[in-house]
Every structure is written in structure tokens, then in C-alpha cells.
């Protein structure tokens, strides 16, 4: 999905809509080659995340094996990534196996707009975490910047309820990284530490500043999660 669709607030700026001369196909192909090269460099840098990705998959497999569930949320393109992930868990990834409990909190437009209208868009995920999350569950938050207020609120609600929070993050990690590292609660009041999960959170920050490359890395990490969760719960295929 186009990076502008991710409403983290710091995505690529909208370009001018003034008419432009169409480029020759050879020049367009060269642009595509440059994108492949850029994506390859980003993916190579992401190898440094392997241990964190493995630890996150282990935490999710442990939760599922113990009767827990995976909650997922994100905005825009990251919401689509969340739907992708929950769908792979509920149905299957590469093998036929029993369905796994996963809920994407960005899927129910009636609930989201109700909360946004009656209270605040900042609370659209947090209230669902409060209602659905139980100690031992895992919340996966997906953001390209770490600065979306509703993601911060969701992570804070998860910590308070005793859920493990796994962040697929980007850029410098933003305020979310600070909260997960320092144990804050996302509302600026350090008096309520919101540390009910015992410090089990995992913050996976995709390298680079390009929103598009960050989203591509997130998609591959999601596939790695699916592969590793299936491996732990069901063995080699």
C-alpha cells in the first residue's frame, strides 16, 4: 500500500498534481531497478533484527500454546499489515493446521468510528485492548514512526492489562520506543508506569527513513512470524 496511506503523521508528502510528461518505458524500468536496489539494501540491513524477530515469534507461540491470543493494530498501510497477519494466523500460512486465535483491532469500522466519535481517535485501539486483552495475550502494534497517539494508547493499555507488547516500528522508534524502554504509559504522566507485563515488551525497529522500505520490511517480518509460530506449534512441515 502506498506509504501516504499510513497515517503515522510523518509519511511522504503529497507531490504536486500538475501534469507531467510521460516517461519512456526504459526510464521507468530504470526507476524500478533503483527501487529493487534500495529495497535490497534495506533488507540486508534488517538482518540485524533476526534475534528480536525470533524472540517475538517465541513469545507469540508461547501465548497461543497457553490458550492466549494475538491482538494486532495499526493505521493505514499498517492496518492492512495487521489484517494480513491476523488472517494468516486464523487460516493458514504455508500448511493446513488448526486456526490460531488472532484479532485485528483495525477491522471493525463500526467499533472504530463509534469510539472515535464518542471519545477520541486516540482511544480506538486502547478500548478494544481493555475489552479483549487478557494477561498472557500478546498485542502487536505496527507503526512506521512510533509516534501515533492511538498506537501509544494501545501499548499502554496492553502493559497495564499484563499483555506482552511487540512493536513493529520504524525510523528512530519515536515516542513508542521511549515508552516501551522506560515503562511509561503513553499519556505523559510518569506517575503511572503501566508495567503490568513485567517488562517483556519487544521493540523491532526497521532500519532507514523511507516509509515504503519500512513497510516492506514489516511485511517480511510478518511472514517470518508466521513461519516461526507454525514451526514451534506444529513442528517441521
Annotate each PLM feature.
Residues 49-55, 99, 235-237:
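Flexible, glycine/charged-enriched surface loops at secondary-structure junctions
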Residues 45-66:
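A short, well-structured juxtamembrane/interface segment
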Residues 1-6, 12-48:
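Generic N-terminal amphipathic, Lys/Arg-enriched alpha-helix
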Residues 78-235:
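Glycine-rich phosphate-binding loops that contact phosphosugars or nucleotide phosphates
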Residues 70-71, 165:
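Hydrophobic beta-strand scaffold residues
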Residues 66-67, 135:
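Structured helix-beta-strand junction loops
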Amino acid at each position: 500500500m502506498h506509504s501516504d496511506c499510513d497515517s503515522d503523521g510523518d509519511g511522504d508528502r503529497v507531490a504536486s498534481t500538475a501534469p507531467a510528461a510521460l516517461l519512456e518505458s526504459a526510464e521507468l524500468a530504470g526507476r524500478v531497478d533503483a527501487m529493487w536496489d534500495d529495497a535490497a539494501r534495506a533488507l540486508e540491513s534488517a538482518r540485524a533484527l533476526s534475534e528480536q524477530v525470533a524472540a517475538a515469534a517465541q513469545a507469540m507461540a508461547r501465548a497461543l500454546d497457553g490458550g492466549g491470543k494475538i491482538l494486532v493494530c495499526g493505521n493505514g498501510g499498517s492496518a492492512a499489515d495487521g489484517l494480513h497477519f491476523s488472517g494468516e494466523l486464523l487460516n493458514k500460512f504455508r500448511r493446513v493446521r488448526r486456526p490460531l486465535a488472532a484479532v485485528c483491532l483495525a477491522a471493525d469500522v463500526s467499533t472504530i468510528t463509534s469510539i472515535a466519535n464518542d471519545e477520541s481517535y486516540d482511544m480506538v485501539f486502547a478500548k478494544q485492548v481493555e475489552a479483549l486483552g487478557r494477561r498472557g495475550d500478546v498485542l502487536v502494534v505496527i507503526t512506521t514512526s512510533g509516534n501515533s497517539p492511538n498506537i501509544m494508547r494501545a501499548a499502554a493499555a496492553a502493559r497495564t492489562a499484563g499483555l506482552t507488547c511487540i512493536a513493529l516500528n520504524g525510523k528512530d522508534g519515536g515516542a513508542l520506543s521511549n515508552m516501551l524502554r522506560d515503562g511509561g504509559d503513553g499519556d505523559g504522566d510518569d506517575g503511572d508506569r503501566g508495567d503490568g507485563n513485567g517488562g517483556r515488551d519487544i521493540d523491532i525497529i526497521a532500519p532507514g527513513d523511507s516509509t515504503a522500505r519500512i513497510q516492506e520490511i514489516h511485511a517480511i517480518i510478518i511472514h517470518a512470524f508466521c513461519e516461526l509460530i507454525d514451526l514451534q506449534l506444529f513442528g517441521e512441515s
